[in-house]
Amino acid sequence: MEFDKEVDASGLNCPLPILRCKKGLSDMSAAQVLKVIATDPGSVKDFNAFCVQTGHELLQLDQDETSFTFYIKKRAD
């Protein structure tokens, strides 16, 4: 999937991946896509809740043995 910016939150536990995501989205334009890589198993639930609460769209979640990759589309302001 194409993306505009990447944030690597590997090795960080809650709430740091979400905080890195919020910071990454802060200087992006509406409809741009942020790729976030995380290793915390709780991040799946956290990112789903974050997107519901903020109005950003979780476009895709990829998972392998060691990490989760989230593609988040920034909402229109």
Kindly give the residue locations of the regions a language model identified.
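An N-terminal amphipathic alpha-helical segment
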Residues: 1-28
